[in-house]
Amino acid sequence: MTGIEQKTPVGGSETGGADGLYAVLPLRDIVVFPHMIVPLFVGREKSIRALEEVMGVDKQILLATQKNAADDDPAPDAIYEIGTIANVLQLLKLPDGTVKVLVEGTARAKISKFTDREDYHEAYAAALQEPEEDAVEIEALARSVVSDFENYVKLNKKISPEVVGTASQIDDYSKLADTVASHLAIKIPEKQEMLSVLSVRERLEKALSFMEAEISVLQVEKRIRSRVKRQMEKTQREYYLNEQMKAIQKELGDSEDGRDEVAEIEERITKTKLSKEAREKALAELKKLRSMSPMSAEATVVRNYLDWLLSIPWGKKSKVKQDLNFAQEVLDAEHFGLGKVKERIVEYLAVQARSTKIKGPILCLVGPPGVGKTSLARSIAKATGREYVRMSLGGVRDEAEIRGHRRTYIGSMPGKVIQSMKKAKKSNPLFLLDEIDKMGQDFRGDPSSAMLEVLDPKQNATFMDHYLEVEYDLSNVMFVTTANTMNIPGPLLDRMEIIRIAGYTEDEKLEIAKRHLLPKAIKDHALQPKEFSVTEDALRNVIRHYTREAGVRSLEREVMTLARKAVTEILKTKKKSVKITDKNLSDYLGVEKFRFGQIDGEDQVGVVTGLAWTEVGGELLTIEGVMMPGKGRMTVTGNLRDVMKESISAAASYVRSRAIDFGIEPPLFDKRDIHVHVPEGATPKDGPSAGIAMVTAIVSVLTGIPVRKDIAMTGEVTLRGRVLPIGGLKEKLLATLRGGIKKVLIPEENAKDLAEIPDNVKNNLEIVPVSRVGEVLKHALVRQPEPIEWTEQENPTAVPPVEDEAGASLAH
């Protein structure tokens, strides 16, 4: 083979005395004896090169076991000096780069020294000769070895019985000793010791010694296994007899038990205030139960049914508190702000105090995460004196989870509504249906349609669960649902009273942190109020620079972080107290995560700040436009959905129709391409409320007039230049305030909504209502575009279409 130095033949003499030069193959976890044919898998580069070398000469290699199997590149002193000279019978390269080789041991050899060869291990070694010995003694030993080996194989199931037949036919006692040694389950050093012994008599004695020790251990193992097996058989027999005895006892004495059980159920039916239909159903099932064998499967189904029917509350009502002042105190103590919700609850209690026939209201609290929708429901239950049960609808896809499974199915149960009523133990609890906008639907049905019956005040008095098969009155239940968005099926939405919970203002968050989050953090972390304090300025900085959310969930996490670090500091430094101020805040929370009140440094052409409303609150939306030489195409990017792309198209058409008024020569549209991009391309965006921002960006690009950096805007635009109203005004104004922008343009028709905006928000912003695009440009552009005179050419070019770009939803 190429690259082989032909100085000395690789492969030495098998006669004793003279050393031969051999390529060495270090072995891991195996000792190869003479007369053995063994397959080996070789993966190390040096070993593969050694094999390739010997395949090119006379196919002999020295197999020597290394002392540490974990050593990838063993040094000469890490390899045992006694090895086996072997013939390479077959060599096969595998696809993964390793080599499968079949070797046959021929003779023992002793390594005298290793060469300095680096590409593979190479050593001088001499084949070892066996000494002459007493043939009679060896034959006697051999017979004992064969006999013991037969017993060993019988006890050790890992060795094939055919090996015994092969061993008994071997006439060469040296080969017999090596064959037996290779099959013994002994450690590598012990096998190496067997290889190192030249005397056949000593090898046979060692094999005999190892086998006798192993046979005694294997016999003990066999006895243990037999004892365990007998014990298991005895246990199983006892279990079987016990079960038989129980069955016989049931047959003999169950008539008494059965009568007692039936009598108990009958008594429960009498005491429970069931409806007429439910009582008839219960008595009919009881009659069936009387005629059944108590141990039958049908009897178990009937008993479970009656247990469910009698366990749910029938006419058991909590006494609803009607003290309006108490209710107001509870709601105010546990939640700051949320005036509309509190007002609605107090109104309900006031009406209930005058009329007992009023049905429970079905409220739907819609707002971003972390504003307190779920915790508010618990406070309402406390204020009204009702039991509180919660059912999460997130990810519910099966109608049976609402209405239950029919009794024909094995293991059927009532739906979650009836299960929750059983848990409440009263027929008029406050029932929270959490995340109602997260319900899905699939081939098993539409759970939102099943909820129609639950949430309709005129239908839920006769709610029918598939398992119970009788009507159950839910009209006294006070249902409260929560959702992040209004993405709820229309018929379901129509049955609920929507109460929007907008995001909190900075001052509201500050009050919540002082009144609720800080005391909670102190309590949860086993601190004393004097040990841990946070200044008002520090809390305000946490709100501004470490959180950006509509709710207070992230704010709570940051306050908890401060408390944890305070506890750690007190225990480590033995301080008596930790005070967090705006100066040392970054030592505890790290670098600021968000900018507050910092806007881009200069007015730019084609860069407009729009406003977006998402399910997690309001956001600033940067809109960028550029113009380049082209053929009048318009490109839109930024993961925009259809409504937003149509809004850009309408804005472009409006600007083109009024080009002369904006000082733009109409032919410019056919000679230039415009690219409108909304950054953060990974976030899907949709909605029409960025219309006036799109118009401003396009006009700025075409005229070269910069847009003011300190102004934000929101409003839908029409082809006639009118500005239409938008939703989510409070959330958008809060986002404007967070972003440090002082002036905001809103549609004139939204001016009436300003009455519901907190005064501290309105006082910190200059809010300008606008009704037409002209007013928008007057406020937004650094200077007004100058109209020009233009004579229209023949065959005017049509407005180019907007190119499609894919995207997903984000409401504006």
Swiss-Prot record:
For region Disordered, the annotated ranges are 787-812
What compartments host this protein?
A: Cytoplasm
Q: Which GO terms describe its biological process?
A: cellular response to heat; protein quality control for misfolded or incompletely synthesized proteins
Keyword match Hydrolase: yes
Q: What disulfide bonds does the UniProt entry report for this chain? A: none
Q: Which residues form the Lon proteolytic domain?
A: 602-783
The record's annotation in InterPro entries points to: AAA+_ATPase, ATPase_AAA_core, Lon_bac, Lon_bac/euk-typ, Lon_lid, Lon_proteolytic, Lon_Prtase, Lon_prtase_N
Residue positions of the active site: S689, K732
Q: Show the PROSITE patterns listed in the entry.
A: LON_N (PS51787), LON_PROTEOLYTIC (PS51786), LON_SER (PS01046)
What switches on expression, per the entry, is described as: By heat shock.
Record-annotated residues binding ATP?
A: G367, P368, P369, G370, V371, G372, K373, T374
Which NCBIfam families does the record match to this protein? Answer: lon, PRK10787.1
Q: How does it assemble?
A: Homohexamer. Organized in a ring with a central cavity.
Q: What does this protein do?
A: ATP-dependent serine protease that mediates the selective degradation of mutant and abnormal proteins as well as certain short-lived regulatory proteins. Required for cellular homeostasis and for survival from DNA damage and developmental changes induced by stress. Degrades polypeptides processively to yield small peptide fragments that are 5 to 10 amino acids long. Binds to DNA in a double-stranded, site-specific manner.
Q: Which family does it belong to?
A: Belongs to the peptidase S16 family.
* Name this polypeptide is given: Lon protease
**Organism of derivation:** Brucella melitensis biotype 1 (strain ATCC 23456 / CCUG 17765 / NCTC 10094 / 16M)
Tell me what gene encodes this: lon
